[in-house]
């Protein structure tokens, strides 16, 4: 089992100490850098004032992107499953009727 250690990350000029298993350290550091970048991007636009509001906007933007990608992957997965079913049906028909295999 992984041992937990405290990791200090800096997000929008503030330090946060987070308890994190060793095997998740790199992922957490990467997530913190990503969040910091998104929050700085929003803050630099000048349209959102206050760290709390910047954090909420960053969370909404990241969540929107995540859900959009998940939806796209779900559609691609569904399309791939359908294509595999079609190919399996063709194989089954070809095996059932070897004389007709060249016509499909």
Curated annotation (Swiss-Prot):
SUPFAM superfamilies: Cell division protein ZapA-like. GO terms for cellular component: cell division site; cell septum; cytosol. The keyword Cytoplasm applies. Residues 66-94 form a coiled coil. Belongs to the ZapA family. Type 1 subfamily. Homodimer. Interacts with FtsZ. This is Cell division protein ZapA. It comes from Pseudomonas aeruginosa (strain ATCC 15692 / DSM 22644 / CIP 104116 / JCM 14847 / LMG 12228 / 1C / PRS 101 / PAO1).
């Amino acid at each position: 089992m992984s041992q937990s250690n405290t990791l200090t990350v800096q997000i929008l000029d503030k330090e946060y100490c987070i308890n994190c298993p060793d095997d998740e350290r790199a992922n957490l550091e990467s997530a913190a850098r990503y969040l910091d970048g998104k929050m700085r991007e929003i803050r630099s636009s000048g349209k959102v004032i206050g760290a709390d509001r910047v954090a909420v906007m960053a969370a909404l933007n990241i969540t929107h992107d995540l859900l959009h990608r998940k939806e796209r992957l779900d559609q691609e997965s569904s399309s791939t499953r359908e294509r595999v079913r079609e190919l399996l049906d063709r194989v089954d028909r070809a095996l059932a009727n070897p004389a007709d295999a060249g016509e499909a």
